[in-house]
Amino acid sequence: MKSARAKTPRKPTVKKGSQTNLKDPVGVYCRVRPLGFPDQECCIEVINNTTVQLHTPEGYRLNRNGDYKETQYSFKQVFGTHTTQKELFDVVANPLVNDLIHGKNGLLFTYGVTGSGKTHTMTGSPGEGGLLPRCLDMIFNSIGSFQAKRYVFKSNDRNSMDIQCEVDALLERQKREAMPNPKTSSSKRQVDPEFADMITVQEFCKAEEVDEDSVYGVFVSYIEIYNNYIYDLLEEVPFDPIKPKPPQSKLLREDKNHNMYVAGCTEVEVKSTEEAFEVFWRGQKKRRIANTHLNRESSRSHSVFNIKLVQAPLDADGDNVLQEKEQITISQLSLVDLAGSERTNRTRAEGNRLREAGNINQSLMTLRTCMDVLRENQMYGTNKMVPYRDSKLTHLFKNYFDGEGKVRMIVCVNPKAEDYEENLQVMRFAEVTQEVEVARPVDKAICGLTPGRRYRNQPRGPVGNEPLVTDVVLQSFPPLPSCEILDINDEQTLPRLIEALEKRHNLRQMMIDEFNKQSNAFKALLQEFDNAVLSKENHMQGKLNEKEKMISGQKLEIERLEKKNKTLEYKIEILEKTTTIYEEDKRNLQQELETQNQKLQRQFSDKRRLEARLQGMVTETTMKWEKECERRVAAKQLEMQNKLWVKDEKLKQLKAIVTEPKTEKPERPSRERDREKVTQRSVSPSPVPLSSNYIAQISNGQQLMSQPQLHRRSNSCSSISVASCISEWEQKIPTYNTPLKVTSIARRRQQEPGQSKTCIVSDRRRGMYWTEGREVVPTFRNEIEIEEDHCGRLLFQPDQNAPPIRLRHRRSRSAGDRWVDHKPASNMQTETVMQPHVPHAITVSVANEKALAKCEKYMLTHQELASDGEIETKLIKGDIYKTRGGGQSVQFTDIETLKQESPNGSRKRRSSTVAPAQPDGAESEWTDVETRCSVAVEMRAGSQLGPGYQHHAQPKRKKP
């Protein structure tokens, strides 16, 4: 029966925080390049194996004291001009390769100015290989017999490795060998003589304590960082002679272990030093180098050669690789050849060389900044962010400084005096880098399998030569005594020999008997054990059959449950879809309901607003019609009273004519008396029934007029002679030709018992301004009429028959301005003699910005229907102003009215200003407030023309 393979114990997890307190500083080494000429001036001197001294060469600026400045810098070890590549490798790179084989990461990079020997240190020269070929040689010397077959390990795109079994690896090898031009071949090929001398290393170097129970695989990759872009030097791009494609840059990614790697980078599996260096040399030919003023082959990019060592333990039998991905250990050694920092004033770089130098210096400056921040965070406990992402170089090696691994730096310097300033900056950077500490890498975890399993099934020699057990037993017998017989008479040697042989024979026979006895006992025991095993096997087989039947039944039950589960899942899916449809319908209905509710609320609000508006309009209309009715009733009453008064006066005049005796014809007065005589006309009754307290007196004690005084009824006040007033009104006697001296106006009528009260009404006084005791002679017919109301206020009433004269505004100065004549299309052409004529005017039917921008004045012709049925034309004038926004605004300043009247219309007589008295506290209801307050006297601030007549009546609101 085949023994069951034991399960591999789980790999113990190692916490990263377990060794976080153990840190090692960055190892910085210094290598001094030999001078090109023996008599060349030198600025660097090696003091001992750890210290160099940098002194100012002749011709440079001295310090403040006038002396040359000498500075010493310490390193972990200093390599002079006579140091060989072997010595440098043993001290710097050998520990890194040893850690690589034991599953630890490492970083080695060279730093210095251009032409300081960095590439020579890393690559070497014919006959003297550098660090890179020596590292490869040491790796393959250590794992040469433990390497896995090709394609057992296969890289993926996630910075990890996959394991293939022997069969899959064999198929992969056959597939690659069947290709017309395989990239790698397992057959031995002749080494390229171009680099054959570089990899011929005479000194044999091998790592110690290599795990023999593991298999190893080596993968190499080669990239360069050019102008802060990453390019794969091993990428095979098909050559197109017509349109060659430029190399594509690669991107940086972070794997699950937070390690940075180049996505899509080519990793080649190598099996020997020659094959690995051949891959390196193929990529080295693609690297960008150029001839500068300081170096014939100057590196224009940073190159990174990665050596990835993959190891996996053997299974418990020691025959095949353990097919568990968790047991794979991947370690990486990065060999970096940094481009040299340079100054453009020395290299005289132009064009692309200048751009390359700028990018190189920028990346090196970023590396120095990262070191400064790391040093400050570690020394002072700060937590500043390290700017790794500012450069692809620092971002690629971020996990070495923040994670685990050993970091080594070789500072290459050229001791010639011309490189003094550059070497000074390099030394300062090296001094800062030595103070940066990196976490110590952890040891590789033990897999837990039995050591030495590789040689478990390997034969130790030929099968036919194996010694028997009896021979082994015989070898344990005591040695025979000496058998040399020197004397013929020797009788002791042979008896001793015979006795020893007999003892050995007896002992051998006894041991054979014991062996046979033990063998028979072991056979019996083995037979019993076989019987017991057989019985147990039969018992286990019966149980196994029962278990298999049970398992088959459970499988059937599982299949039934799976079918039921699928049916239920299908029903659940249908229900979920139905629920989704219902929920969607519900959401749509809810949205529609919300929309309808909002619409209903808006309608309700509009309805309430409309109801309130209608209520207000009804109330306003009701109040308006009530006022209008009251006003019309009052006007009708007043009209009737006036008619009664006129009839009463006519009756009185007729009565006076009838009753008066006939007298002689009066003598015609002279002109002088006519001038001094105050001619009065009959005053029409006031449109309102005035209070009986209103009287008019003549100032300075003058006598009343000679006309006979007539009295109204008992309910009215005394008045002047009605006959003279009527005759004067009928004869149209102008009253403004007679001067009138007015001293005062009685605000209240004095009621005295037994004295007849007479209301002396003088002709209406017209004038712009008057004073007490001064004669005022009106000069214009349209001057303001001044009256007194029952409250003692002065009323200024214009003469309605006077010609219209604009008193408020000055004469228009539009003669020199350009006008916009706005005549709407709805206006009608009037046949008046006086027509508005504006020269150089722009006539428009609709006001526009273009016309307003060209003119300074604006005139709008507006027509409306007057109260008498005639068309009234208003010319509304204004000034045009420019606004800040670039437009125009119009400020209206004046209105001119053009109106036609019929000359046959009867002139309405004015009512008398004297009205019957009303009780105290009673208010006048003859008209509304709007009509009473429509006329006022207004004087603007700063005006020198005196008060002016202004009409403030608002137009009646039309019915909606």
Swiss-Prot record:
Biological process, per Gene Ontology: microtubule-based movement; mitotic cytokinesis; mitotic spindle elongation; mitotic spindle midzone assembly; positive regulation of cytokinesis
Positions contributing to ATP binding: G112, V113, T114, G115, S116, G117, K118, T119
Residues recorded as bearing Phosphoserine in the entry: S155, S160, S605, S682, S684, S814, S867, S902, S911
Region of interest (Disordered), ranges: 1-20, 659-691, 898-928, 941-960
Glycyl lysine isopeptide (Lys-Gly) (interchain with G-Cter in SUMO2) crosslink, residue number(s): K571, K586, K624, K647, K662, K665, K741, K823, K854, K874, K877, K899, K956
SUPFAM superfamilies recorded: P-loop containing nucleoside triphosphate hydrolases
InterPro entries: Kif23_Arf-bd, Kif23_Arf-bd_sf, Kinesin-like_fam, Kinesin_motor_CS, Kinesin_motor_dom, Kinesin_motor_dom_sf, P-loop_NTPase
Post-translational note: Ubiquitinated. Deubiquitinated by USP8/UBPY.
Cysteine pairs bridged by disulfides in the record: none
Main location (coarse class): nucleus
Keyword Coiled coil appears in the UniProt entry: yes
One Gene Ontology CC term in the entry: cytosol
Biased composition (Basic residues): 1-14
Localisation per UniProt entry: Nucleus; Cytoplasm, Cytoskeleton, Spindle; Midbody, Midbody ring
GO molecular function: ATP binding; ATP hydrolysis activity; microtubule binding; microtubule motor activity
Biased composition (Low complexity): 682-691
PANTHER family, alphabetized: KINESIN-LIKE PROTEIN KIF23, KINESIN-RELATED
Similarity section: Belongs to the TRAFAC class myosin-kinesin ATPase superfamily. Kinesin family.
Associated pathology: Anemia, congenital dyserythropoietic, 3A: An autosomal dominant blood disorder characterized by ineffective erythropoiesis, hemolytic anemia, macrocytosis in the peripheral blood, intravascular hemolysis, and giant multinucleated erythroblasts in the bone marrow.
Protein name stated in the entry: Kinesin-like protein KIF23
Gene: KIF23
